[in-house]
Amino acid sequence: MIKIPSDFKAFIFDLDGTLADTMPIHYKACQLVCNKNGFDFPEEYFYQEAGKPTIEVFTNLMQELEIKGFNGSELGQEKEKIFLELISMVEPLHIVADIAKSYKGKIPMAIGSGGQRKTVELTLDAINFNNFFDSIVTCDDVEKYKPDPETFLKAAFEMGVDPKDCVVFEDGNPGIEAAKAAGMMVVDVREFL
């Protein structure tokens, strides 16, 4: 069972790998794009970059692997298209989803995701969590991505809650860093999955 810090007034949930079991499907989509183009997407790198926008991840991957002739933005968009074709396979991560269900309507709750808005909304639909949240902040809504705290600070602002009174549920190191930098309490859900 997940231990929730006391003295909270609001929850902010990361989506991919926290509220929804999307990470294996995102990785599969990444692999399909890379394999189609003749290279591999290292699984360790994928999980290290968890929480960052797809386009940024692919752009960084091209640089890190010194792969020339590919546009990280185009590959990222292609990966998102493939993910959306596979989205019906997404299930909620029940240990976290049950927390959201039990607090629905009792406290303000938000999504703070590094995903694109369209993908986030379709993922929430796939797991039947649309209309659960007072705020949804995606990479389309901020200038700086996780590990910068902007995503979570914007979610707190939109809920009208002081950042120090928010608990963030996260599965990625960049998101955990972002929550701490925002002065929020954070639950690393990887300990419970």
Located regions from the model:
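Asp-based, Mg2+/Mn2+-dependent phosphohydrolase catalytic module
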Residues: 1-9, 101, 116-193
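Active-site neighborhood of HAD-like aspartate-dependent phosphohydrolases
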Residues: 1-48, 181-182, 192
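Short beta->alpha linker loops
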Residues: 25, 49-53, 78, 91-95, ...
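Metal-dependent phosphoesterase signature
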Residues: 62-98
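Short, acidic loop-to-helix structural element flanking the phosphoryl-transfer center
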Residues: 84-111, 117, 121
